[in-house]
UniProtKB/Swiss-Prot annotation:
Function comment: Antimicrobial peptide with potent activity against Gram-positive bacteria S.aureus (MIC=10 uM) and S.agalactiaea (MIC=15 uM), and Gram-negative bacteria E.coli (MIC=24 uM) and P.aeruginosa (MIC=15 uM), as well as against yeasts Candida albicans (MIC=3.1 uM) and C.glabrata (MIC=25 uM). Also elicits low hemolysis on human erythrocytes (HC(50)=167 uM).
Expression tissues: Expressed by the venom gland.
Propeptide positions: 49-77
Disulphide connectivity of cysteines: none
GO CC term, one of those recorded: other organism cell membrane
Keywords associated with the record: Antibiotic, Antimicrobial, Cleavage on pair of basic residues, Cytolysis, Fungicide, Membrane, Secreted, Signal, Target cell membrane, Target membrane
GO biological process, one term: defense response to bacterium
Native organism: Mesomexovis punctatus
Protein name as catalogued: VpAmp2.0
Family: Belongs to the non-disulfide-bridged peptide (NDBP) superfamily. Medium-length antimicrobial peptide (group 3) family.
Signal sequence coordinates: 1-23
Compartment(s): Secreted; Target cell membrane
C-alpha cells in the first residue's frame, strides 16, 4: 500500500514538472466539466429547451402552434 502511495506521489510530482502535465490536467478538466453537469442533471433541461427552440423556428414547419409560440414568448416577459 505504501508503494502505491509513493508511486502516486512520484507520478503527480513528475506531471507538475514536465510539459506533459498541461495535456494531462487539460484532459482531467474537460472530463470534469462533462461529468459535473451530467451528475447534477442540469444539462437535460437545457437540451430540452434548445430542442424546443429548434422545433419552434423550423422553417419547414407547416402548422405553427400559436399557443406554443405564446407560451414560449411569455417566458421572456
Amino acid at each position: 500500500m505504501q508503494l502505491r502511495k509513493a508511486l502516486l506521489v512520484i507520478f503527480v510530482a513528475y506531471l507538475l514538472v514536465t510539459d506533459e502535465a498541461e495535456a494531462f490536467w487539460g484532459f482531467l478538466g474537460k472530463l470534469a466539466m462533462k461529468a459535473v453537469p451530467s451528475l447534477i442533471g442540469g444539462n437535460k433541461s437545457s437540451s430540452k429547451r434548445k430542442r424546443e427552440i429548434e422545433d419552434l423556428f423550423d422553417p419547414y414547419q407547416k402548422d405553427l402552434d400559436l399557443q406554443r409560440l405564446d407560451r414560449f414568448f411569455s417566458q421572456f416577459q
